[in-house]
């Protein structure tokens, strides 16, 4: 146990209250597990909302379900004919949706590993997907430049939004389900009313670099965007203002997933094209840790819902998932 040495004149008497130990200003993420199972570049990793599982998708057209704590392969989901770009969990952790270059989305029952429905309607690669919080709707984004909203129960497309003028890179539902955010290679980030399909706001940067990732913050007040000029930004979208900018990583080519870490202190986490995971202090914007170990571009970084655990995944010269954990 570390002892704090105080100058003599400030030493506490035995009767005074003990000093509060300050939480460390930086995390100490260390590698715990390396998961190998995919035979091609991994595209996405996501923890289940209940924290038990990790789903990964890859260019081998497979989804693998892993134990989040033991790293064991629990299930492999077969069905897509071409590479998968994204996967997302339902709120009760019982179902998954996947987005594929075969122009379809598939809805899966996790326990049985069976495909429940195939959602057809996009005319080009489906690149990104998400469930709304009640998990009765799915949103998808495609290289056909549209965003589609699907009904889970029937598998029908309820709405098609002519969202952007270039491929859609990311879609995400707000925590109350009322809004959808989309990002595109056209350099725009758009916020949509999920019920009406109306565009409520457009966020754009000077120079309009391609938007490679977007996500609402867990409290729903902010949006995190990534652009292909190696920049992450935190937006107060209700005012259309950029509040924070995070730099130091490399992101010029790939749509790399980023995440908010809120289980300990508040960090922003992202993969990088220099084969590392970057962690920033959300408030101060300083890089607090870089995680080394992958041997190719880290395409995806996901944070566990309740523990200080990060999963990262890399492209074809690596093909592994790494699980990292921190004491705080």
Curated annotation (Swiss-Prot):
Pfam families: Beta-prop_WDR5
Domain of life: Eukaryota
Motif DDB1-binding motif mapped to chain: 186-190
Keyword S-adenosyl-L-methionine recorded: no
Range of residues in the leader sequence: none
WD repeat copies, ranges: 37-76, 79-120, 122-162, 163-202, 206-247, 250-290, 293-328
Function recorded in the entry: May function as a substrate receptor for CUL4-DDB1 ubiquitin E3 ligase complex.
Name used for this protein in its record: WD repeat-containing protein 5B
Species: Rattus norvegicus (Rat)
Gene giving rise to this polypeptide: Wdr5b
């Amino acid at each position: 146990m570390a002892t704090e040495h105080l100058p003599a004149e400030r030493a506490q008497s035995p009767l005074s209250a003990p000093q509060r130990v300050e939480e460390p200003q930086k995390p100490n993420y260390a590698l715990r597990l390396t998961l190998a199972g995919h035979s091609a570049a991994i595209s996405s990793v996501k923890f289940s909302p209940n924290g038990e599982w990790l789903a990964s998708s890859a260019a081998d057209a497979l989804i693998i379900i892993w134990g989040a704590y033991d790293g064991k392969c629990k299930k492999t989901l077969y069905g897509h004919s071409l590479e998968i770009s994204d996967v997302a969990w339902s709120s009760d952790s019982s179902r998954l949706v996947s987005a594929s270059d075969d122009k379809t989305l598939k809805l899966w029952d996790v326990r049985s590993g069976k495909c429940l429905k195939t959602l057809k309607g996009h005319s080009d690669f489906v690149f990104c997907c998400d469930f709304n919080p009640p998990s009765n709707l799915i949103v998808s984004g495609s290289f056909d430049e549209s965003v589609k909203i699907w009904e889970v129960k029937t598998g029908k497309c309820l709405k098609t939004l002519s969202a952007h003028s270039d491929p859609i890179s990311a879609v995400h539902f707000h925590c109350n389900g009322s809004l959808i955010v989309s990002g595109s290679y056209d350099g725009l980030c758009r916020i949509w009313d999920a019920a009406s399909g109306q565009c409520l706001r457009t966020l754009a940067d000077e120079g309009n670099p391609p938007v490679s990732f977007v996500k609402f913050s867990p409290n729903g007040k902010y949006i995190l965007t990534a652009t292909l000029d190696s920049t992450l930004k935190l937006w107060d979208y209700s005012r259309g203002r950029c509040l924070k900018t995070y730099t130091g990583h490399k992101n010029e080519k790939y749509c790399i997933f980023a995440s908010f870490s809120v289980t300990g202190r508040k960090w922003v986490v992202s993969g990088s094209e220099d084969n590392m995971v970057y962690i920033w202090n959300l408030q101060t914007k300083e890089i607090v840790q870089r995680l080394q170990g992958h041997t190719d571009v880290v395409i995806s970084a996901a944070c566990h819902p309740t523990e200080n655990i990060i999963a990262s995944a890399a492209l074809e010269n690596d093909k592994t998932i790494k699980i990292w954990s921190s004491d705080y």
